[in-house]
Each structure stands twice: as C-alpha cells, then as structure tokens.
Amino acid sequence: MKIAVFGQFYQNSTSPIIARLFAFLNQNNIQVVIEEKFAAILIENKSIANTYQKFSSHKDLDKSFEMLISVGGDGTFLRATTLVRNSGIPILGINAGRLGFLATVQQENIETFLQLVLEKKYTISKRTLLSLKCASKIEEIKDLNFAMNEITVSRKDTTSMITIETYLNGEYLNSYWADGLIISTPTGSTGYSMSCGGPILTPEANCLVITPIAPHNLNARPLVIPDNTEIKLKVSGREENYLVSLDSRIASVKNEDILTIKKTPFKINMIEIPEETFLKTLRNKLLWGEDKRN
C-alpha cells in the first residue's frame, strides 16, 4: 500500500499525532511519501528520520497512491484538495486543529481508524467543488480555480458596501448590497456560510447556497439552488478592486469583471469512517441535541 502524507504546520501538540501515525504506518509496512515542505518541518523538529520519499506537487501523485492523509485542521484538508485535484485519490483527515468537520480522525482513534481503512471498512463521500472563471486573468489563482468549501466575493480597502449583481443561468436574480456574497457547496455549508446565517446541507445534497454577508437590503436571505446552476456575478463599488476567495486562496479583481461560478466536472473523494459520519459530526462538533440546562 502506498500513501501520501501532507501537513502545513508543526506544534507541540502535533508531536504525539505524528509519532502515532508513523508508528502505525511503519508497523504495517506501508510505503509513505511525504510532501516535501511538511517533511522538512518534521525532520527539523526531529519527528521523523530523513529516509522517506517526498513529493513536491500534484504532478507527483499518480494512480499508484491509494490515499492521501492530511494532518492538521480543516484548512489543511482544503489545501490537500489542491494536491489531489481530479486524480480521484481519496483523502483522510487526521485532526490536529480545532473543530474538525473534514479532519474527523481524532488523536486517540488514529490506530483504530487506520486499521479500518486498511481493512477497507470505510465509505467514500464524494464532495462537490466549485470552479471560477473570470473575464480577465487572475494571476494569483492560475490553475487552482476551484474550491471545496466556498467562493466568496467581498469588499477591499474600504468600509463601504459593494453591489453584487447576481444571475442564475442567465436570468437576473438580485443585486446584493452587502459586505460580500458567499457561494457555498454542501461541504462549505457548515463553514463561513453557516456563520452568516446560511442553512446546513448534507454532503449528498445536489445543491449550492448563496449567502449574503451583512446585507443592507434586509429582505435578502440565503438561497438554496440546484448545483447544476451557472452563477454569474458582477461586482461594483467605490474602490477599483474587490476580493475573491476560493477557500483560503485570495485574489484581487477589478470592478465590473464578470465572474462565472459553476460545479466542477470532478469531485473530491473523502474517506468516511462509520464511527465518524456527517450526522455524528454535527452532534459532536455543533452539540446538536445537547441541553446545557440539565
């Protein structure tokens, strides 16, 4: 079995996670290939020996890899999708961060859950992604023009609101007068969109959510639409530029440039352990059903 390992940061709390992970992988004779920057961090902190193979980009991840393990929080998991892209390689998230909606494997369960993975006792949750196309070239994004959580437009260098003309399949929907607008996938519905009052979607829902950020037109509410909808946005404001973000990647775009957002032709395969389903994660992470009065 051949797997890739990816992470972004190292903290004191990460050390036991790395130790348990690599002990299990080595004991089971699994071929491990580590992302080179993460490997350098681990070697510097004496967490691993400098004997592992390394990879540097998505081009190195071919069909010989059975999965990629992301070590970190949800942000690290989202970054891992830029390495996997359309390869179909499943991602398993080990949580070394905080909430962990995507990185669902906790430290105390590393060996148990990885054993289930080795025994193929898991399911694949296929996650929708969004693609972005801009009328003018966005240098900061280049070929990473997709997002697993959300694509967001927001104001830049101003406290003034922006106006976002929104079209669905060519038909005018609304002009949002707000701090910004979130286009969220079902995966992203538990993130930024939820914080702005958007609904939670199950991962299997074939829908997207349009959620305004602090809208001044108070009757503008989050809207759930089919995920085969093509969305066009035209942003105007007092400043020359506004911001567009794809998960954690951000770029500056000129006013009046047309953004086209739609579902990508590929999905991300996320490994889901039976003990850590989406509904269980809702109960455990958002404390659904818990009554603190008792």
Curated annotation (Swiss-Prot):
<dbReference type="GO" id="GO:0005737">
    <property type="term" value="C:cytoplasm"/>
</dbReference>
<keyword id="KW-0067">ATP-binding</keyword>
<dbReference type="GO" id="GO:0046872">
    <property type="term" value="F:metal ion binding"/>
</dbReference>
<dbReference type="GO" id="GO:0005524">
    <property type="term" value="F:ATP binding"/>
</dbReference>
<dbReference type="GO" id="GO:0051287">
    <property type="term" value="F:NAD binding"/>
</dbReference>
<feature type="binding site">
    <location>
        <begin position="149"/>
        <end position="150"/>
    </location>
    <ligand>
        <name>NAD(+)</name>
    </ligand>
</feature>
<feature type="binding site">
    <location>
        <position position="79"/>
    </location>
    <ligand>
        <name>NAD(+)</name>
    </ligand>
</feature>
<dbReference type="InterPro" id="IPR017438">
    <property type="entry name" value="ATP-NAD_kinase_N"/>
</dbReference>
<keyword id="KW-0547">Nucleotide-binding</keyword>
<keyword id="KW-0808">Transferase</keyword>
<keyword id="KW-0521">NADP</keyword>
<keyword id="KW-0520">NAD</keyword>
<dbReference type="GO" id="GO:0006741">
    <property type="term" value="P:NADP biosynthetic process"/>
</dbReference>
<feature type="binding site">
    <location>
        <begin position="190"/>
        <end position="195"/>
    </location>
    <ligand>
        <name>NAD(+)</name>
    </ligand>
</feature>
<keyword id="KW-0963">Cytoplasm</keyword>
<dbReference type="GO" id="GO:0019674">
    <property type="term" value="P:NAD metabolic process"/>
</dbReference>
<feature type="active site" description="Proton acceptor">
    <location>
        <position position="74"/>
    </location>
</feature>
<dbReference type="Pfam" id="PF20143">
    <property type="entry name" value="NAD_kinase_C"/>
</dbReference>
<feature type="binding site">
    <location>
        <position position="179"/>
    </location>
    <ligand>
        <name>NAD(+)</name>
    </ligand>
</feature>
<feature type="binding site">
    <location>
        <begin position="74"/>
        <end position="75"/>
    </location>
    <ligand>
        <name>NAD(+)</name>
    </ligand>
</feature>
<dbReference type="GO" id="GO:0003951">
    <property type="term" value="F:NAD+ kinase activity"/>
</dbReference>
<dbReference type="InterPro" id="IPR002504">
    <property type="entry name" value="NADK"/>
</dbReference>
<dbReference type="Pfam" id="PF01513">
    <property type="entry name" value="NAD_kinase"/>
</dbReference>
<comment type="function">
    <text>Involved in the regulation of the intracellular balance of NAD and NADP, and is a key enzyme in the biosynthesis of NADP. Catalyzes specifically the phosphorylation on 2'-hydroxyl of the adenosine moiety of NAD to yield NADP.</text>
</comment>
<dbReference type="InterPro" id="IPR016064">
    <property type="entry name" value="NAD/diacylglycerol_kinase_sf"/>
</dbReference>
<keyword id="KW-0418">Kinase</keyword>
<dbReference type="InterPro" id="IPR017437">
    <property type="entry name" value="ATP-NAD_kinase_PpnK-typ_C"/>
</dbReference>
<protein>
    <recommendedName>
        <fullName>NAD kinase</fullName>
        <ecNumber>2.7.1.23</ecNumber>
    </recommendedName>
</protein>
<feature type="binding site">
    <location>
        <position position="214"/>
    </location>
    <ligand>
        <name>NAD(+)</name>
    </ligand>
</feature>
<comment type="similarity">
    <text>Belongs to the NAD kinase family.</text>
</comment>
